[in-house]
Regions:
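Membrane-embedded transmembrane alpha-helical bundles that form the catalytic cores
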Residues: 1-506
Length: 507
């Protein structure tokens, strides 16, 4: 019962809404907790004990950190964080670590071998672990008061719309609203289900249709080169964006039905003018978490302060800032890569963006001088278009390695990009051999155009749903029915289509 399945939004969600509304206000958070645990148990069964364990550790750590002495508070926080990280590291990374240590032992003929064990990963562990660590850190920094009711904390960590794919919430984002138990309002229901419908369009009409092309190109990578590698990278990037952002639409819409506002996870990332801006618009909640709990602490660490004091005396301000930035960014991008999975491709992906962003920072003063010398206005349309196109190249290259099954395959595909690059393959019928016909490709292109128009309005701070709700009843119903019609008629599901799992649910 994934978010995009009819059983979720036509059966499960309405049942929860009815049960929630019928319950007394003071226990509605308990109703949400009950259904959230039921939802989790459907996917993870006995692995729910890890969620229960993480919740208990988080609760006790928060309470002890808030009441402990100054010296003990830090020790308690460190123990709590490492208990949570320990579960995540063992479940997600122990096999990867053992494989690479064994490879090293084999290289030096040491004769030792670690057992390689693969664990079934509990649903959402990468998401709720970060939320739990953020909660404990916020209590330690006295940004929030510790939650006294463990059930309310459990709901914050397990709320069913966010447990599978996020967004990664801070306690201050949702906890108070979840605990209030406000009445369900018709406007919230309408806005919520409109958002769910929009997410379904992106997921089942576009992303699931592109899945066929992506699988064909990446599974048969050895047979493709030149412009077809570009098609592979672009197709996967669009598939990933449409699926992940579509899922976020469903998630945010589901929460909105209860009057709960979740943080946005995407903000039109493909209008970004550089890689840094892209990551401020893409998977926003993950970037915010890394910035708050890794980047800022490292920036204020003893190592960084020592470097700054040394650099002020012996180097230029430029070198001081670049090295300080590298010190803070490096652990962020290592963690970003490994958070996605135990794979060298993911680690390379993180290091790729570390290098790209550092190059952008280093070149920024020179670019500004160049623009001033050539009298290029920063807001000139042609200049911004060039910067956006440059960022697209960076994004598509990164996603090529991100999607490749191994780093070696990613390297092979990247090298193949420069072999026999014939743009003619885009219209000579080659695209029609990838699993989609002309009609299917046409559906994708028209749907992308619709999404692009809506994203343009959102970039202009226009509330599209609000505009629709202000229209007369016949117009509103025309929009509702059109959205339902598009999803039902053009969705890539049923006979002839392969069911596509949610990509980020695997992280």
């Amino acid at each position: 019962m994934a978010y995009h399945e009819s059983m979720y939004f036509l059966v499960f969600l309405p049942v929860v809404l009815i049960g929630y509304q019928l319950a007394p206000k003071r226990v509605r958070f308990g109703v949400l907790l009950f259904f959230s645990y039921c939802f989790y148990f459907l996917f993870s069964h006995r692995l729910i004990v890890y969620l229960l364990g993480a919740t208990t550790i988080t609760y006790l750590t928060g309470r002890l950190v808030a009441t402990g002495e100054k010296k003990r508070r830090k020790t308690i926080l460190i123990v709590g964080v490492w208990l949570l990280l320990g579960m995540l590291l063992v479940m997600k990374y122990s096999g990867f670590f053992a494989e690479n240590v064994n490879a090293l032992f084999g290289t030096i003929n040491l004769g030792l071998r670690l057992p390689v064990r693969r664990f079934l990963l509990p649903l959402g562990i990468s998401f709720y672990t970060l939320s739990a660590i953020g909660y404990m850190a916020d209590v330690y920094w006295k940004k929030i008061e510790p939650e006294k009711n463990i059930a309310k904390l459990a709901l914050f960590l397990s709320f069913f719309p966010i447990i599978m794919e996020g967004p990664i919430c801070m306690y201050s984002d949702t906890a108070e609203t979840l605990a209030k138990g406000e009445d369900i309002r018709s406007e919230n229901l309408i806005r919520g289900y409109m958002r769910i419908g929009w997410g379904l369009l992106k997921k089942v009409v576009i992303a699931d249709r592109l899945y066929v092309v992506v699988q064909t190109l990446f599974d048969g990578y050895a047979s493709y080169h030149g412009v077809m590698i570009v098609v592979a990278a672009v197709s996967y990037t669009v598939q990933l964006y449409m699926e992940f952002s579509g899922c976020m639409d469903i998630v945010i819409g589901s929460a909105e039905c209860f009057g709960v506002t979740l943080p946005e996870n995407f903000a039109q990332p493909f209008v970004s003018k550089n890689a840094s801006e892209f990551w401020r618009r893409w998977h926003i909640s993950l970037g915010r978490w890394f910035k708050t709990y890794i980047f800022y602490p490292v920036s204020m660490s003893k190592l960084t302060r020592k470097w700054n004091r040394f650099a002020k005396k012996h180097t230029s301000k430029y070198i001081m800032l670049m090295v300080a930035s590298a010190i803070a960014f490096f652990p962020v991008w290592v963690c970003n890569g490994l958070w996605h999975g135990a794979n060298w491709s993911y680690l390379f992906y993180g290091m790729y963006y570390f290098v790209v962003i550092m190059i952008e920072l280093m070149l920024e003063p020179a670019v500004k001088k160049l623009c001033a010398a050539w009298k290029i206005a920063e807001d000139a349309a042609w200049w911004n278009v060039l910067r956006i196109l440059k960022t697209w190249v960076i994004i598509f290259t990164g996603e090529l390695f991100f999607r490749a099954d191994t780093l070696g395959i990613g390297m092979h595909m990247f090298r193949s990009l420069f072999h026999d690059f014939s743009i003619q393959k885009l219209w000579d019928g080659t695209l029609l051999t990838l699993g989609l016909g002309r009609v299917e490709i046409g559906i994708i292109l028209v749907s992308l155009l619709i999404v692009g128009v809506v994203n343009h309005f959102r970039e202009q701070q226009i509330d599209v749903r609000g505009v629709i709700l202000q229209k007369r009843l016949p117009v509103r119903w025309l929009v509702y029915l059109a959205l339902i019609f598009v999803v039902l008629i053009f969705g890539a599901y049923g006979p002839g289509y392969q069911e596509v799992d949610l990509i980020y649910a695997g992280f």
